[in-house]
Amino acid sequence: YLGFDPERRPRRTLGEAAKEAGWRVGYVTNTRITHATPACFYAHHSDRYDEETVAAQLLDADVDLALGGGLTYFLPVEKNGARRDGRNLVEEARERGTRVLLRNDIPAWNGEGRLIGLFANSHLAYELDDRNYPRSRRDPTLAVLARTALDGLSRGDRPFFLMLEGGRIDHAGHEFDAAGVVAETLRFDE
């Protein structure tokens, strides 16, 4: 469940509580931004695997910044996405005044307006694997995304809440990839 208790009653998320208190709110992950961990801070859905619905809920959530992967759940099938309802959430977000960054955009934010960054169709690459690509094809690192969020959220005098997840370490662990786990862990020092 995302944003529900075991009896399927909606519950306020941590992100919603921070917004109600007047804080700025951001989410950064190297997984899909619609994946269970980041989604539990803004979404309300009984099925954590229904990432099409979760993506649509991100557009409606009171969020200042969301950076990660998962572009496929924001685009319709005819645009090489996974959305079967035909909605193009990238365009919808832009129509609402949200700045949307995609794969080759440089993550930067001055803290003004709303920013969504979708830097990969699914999860961002493992840190170990990403180093083998030419620089022009590499995903932004978790450290770059974190600095972007911190630079923008810390502007002004309002407090902020930032959920920062290095979720690829979990994926490497599920795959019994010791080198991947170590590489992901070492990147936290950045």
Regions found by a protein language model. Name each.
Residues A36-F41, S122-P134, A149, D157-E190:
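Active-site His/acidic residue clusters
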Residues Y1-E7, R11, G15-L145:
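Surface-exposed loop and adjacent secondary-structure segments within mature catalytic domains
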Residues A61, R155-G156:
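Alpha-helix C-cap/termination motif
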Residues G152:
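An active-site-proximal beta-strand-loop segment
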